[in-house]
Amino acid sequence: MSTMSESFATAGSLIVAADPNLLHIVALSLQVSLTAVFLAACLGLPIGAAVAVGRFPGRKPLTVILNGMMGLPPVVIGLLVYLLLSRAGPLGSFGLLFTPTAMVIAQVVLITPIIAALSRQIVADAWRDYEEQLRSLGASTPRAALTLLVDTRFSLSTAVLAGLGRAVAEVGAVMIVGGNIDGVTRVMTTSIALETSKGDLPLALALGFILISIVLILNALAHVVREWAVRRHG
């Protein structure tokens, strides 16, 4: 019991003292995840809007695929990206494996379907309400999709925040493609796994506290934005 209490006390001390190693790991985690979410949003939001508004052959199967890809196994994504970036892979000449860039790529592949599927549902709901008005104004499909993306931007922010929460908490894919290299590709989730296996509980607990806090803040922010959007736009 004393060992457990000492571990919690030391973890708190690391956070309060702003341990440099701790801060570096947290900063790298946020850098990788925020970059991945930005790129995934640039891809996922237009895809979701296009599927919601467009009428083309294969639209329903594509919707099913998008929804299904929300549950992609992270380790499988990590393995596929590893094969692409390895020396024997098609992108091996770029030397991206075991770098933060490889981790960003893995997270983009993982969270783009999440953002696309959630945004498709949000835009589809708005499309049912405004389709007649937009058609009467002569809006083309791309124009209608863009208009609805702008109109539902606050609701869409919850989809982006959901993607960010998924990215920050990811461990399997980033460990495979990043290699968990100290000072280079070691992020919060991979550090927690490593330090726990080594028996360094204080650092693992400190990172765990920070990770849980980030996830809770993101979920609370998503809830606040969603409620505010409902009150403002109905």
Residue ranges and their predicted role:
Residues 33, 37-49, 75, 79, ...:
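Hydrophobic positions within alpha-helical transmembrane segments of bacterial inner-membrane proteins
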Residues 27-35, 69, 142, 146-158, ...:
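Alpha-helical transmembrane segments of multi-pass membrane proteins
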Residues 6-13, 20, 77-108, 178-181:
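Membrane-interfacial helix termini and adjacent extracytoplasmic/periplasmic loops
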Residues 35-66, 141, 148, 219-227:
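Transmembrane-helix boundary motif in ABC transporter permease subunits
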Residues 118-119, 123, 141-173:
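Transmembrane alpha-helices
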Residues 1-37, 53-59, 148, 197-202:
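Periplasmic/extracellular loop-to-transmembrane helix junction in inner-membrane transport proteins
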Residues 15-21, 176-216, 220-221:
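Interhelical loop and adjacent transmembrane-helix boundary motif
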Residues 114-131, 135-138, 142-147, 205-234:
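C-terminal transmembrane helix and the adjacent membrane-cytosol boundary/short C-terminal tail
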